[in-house]
From Swiss-Prot:
Pathway info: Cofactor biosynthesis; molybdopterin biosynthesis
EC number: 4.6.1.17
Designated gene of the protein: moaC
Main enzyme class: lyase
Any GO BP: Mo-molybdopterin cofactor biosynthetic process
UniProt name for this protein: Cyclic pyranopterin monophosphate synthase
Family annotation (InterPro entries): MoaC (IPR023045), MoaC_bact/euk (IPR047594), MoaC_sf (IPR036522), MoCo_biosynth_MoaA/MoaC (IPR050105), Mopterin_CF_biosynth-C_dom (IPR002820)
Lineage of producing organism: Bacteria, Pseudomonadati, Pseudomonadota, Gammaproteobacteria, Enterobacterales
Family stated for the protein in its record: Belongs to the MoaC family.
Length: 159
């Protein structure tokens, strides 16, 4: 089994030194879902929500979250992201919203946490904007879909 990289030999948490790593193009995609009642989803789709455009707000929140991941997750490095994309898709057949994010950079460490944080915060923003009309929405699952670049190689979730 692979060792945890954020734990030193004394068992203490530390930020990984990436200075000796090669710069490569790194990309990660993640997804999250927000399940809700049909009426709540219809309000989002038809734009009648009193707080405004739910998808636009969630998209911006996800982008901002990716850029601030290093401030939220203690051992993440601050990164110079070159791409953050947040796609939101209403899925009326399932009474939910699907969020897919993509983060990219050329650097020495991966962007998995940035993609996951973007998806999570976009989902939380949808909840925040819609909680006045429905409090029992369900967020999840949130998961990494793909990652590429870096020493550990590529990853793709089995769908």
């Amino acid at each position: 089994m692979t060792q945890l990289t954020h734990i030193n030999t004394a068992g203490e948490a530390h930020m990984v030194d990436v200075s000796a790593k090669n710069e490569t193009v790194r990309e990660a995609r993640a997804e999250a879902f927000v399940d809700m009642q049909a009426a709540t989803l219809a309000m989002i789709i038809d734009g009648s929500h009193h707080k405004g455009d739910v998808f636009a707000t969630a998209r911006i929140a996800g982008i901002q979250a990716a850029k601030k991941t290093w401030e939220l997750i203690p051992l993440c490095h601050p990164l110079l992201l070159t791409k953050v994309e947040v796609k939101l898709e209403a899925q009326p057949e399932h009474n939910r919203v699907r969020i897919e994010t993509c983060c990219r950079l050329t650097g020495k460490t991966g962007v998995e946490m940035e993609a996951l944080t973007a998806a999570s915060v976009a989902a939380l923003t949808i909840y925040d904007m819609c909680k006045a009309v429905q409090k029992d929405m369900i967020i999840g699952p949130v998961r990494l879909l793909t990652k590429s670049g870096g020493k550990s190689g590529d990853f793709k979730v089995d769908i």
